[in-house]
Amino acid sequence: MVSFDPQLGVLRVSGDEDASTVSYRRRPLSTALRATRDVVVDLSGLRFADSTLMLDLAVLAQRLRKRGRTLRLRGARPQVRFLIEQMGLDRQPAVMLEVLA
């Protein structure tokens, strides 16, 4: 499940996100594109993700960058963080992966 709070600039991603949930992500991702601040992606509730979510977040980051904004990835569990790193999302310009110690 993906939702966006425009007042806080937080995109919350929870549960399982894969190719079968792509259509449900479109509206919150589109809303996040219009953010007037940097966007924080709260991944703390995400149990499973595949490459489709990472690609959607990469596109969001590219579009936000064109508007002078950044995408901050926060609260990723180890397996999700591994996928972020494998897909290279954390190396994209304007993407910051916040890792808890």
Language model: regions and residue ranges:
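STAS-like cytosolic regulatory interaction modules
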Residues: 1-52, 58-101
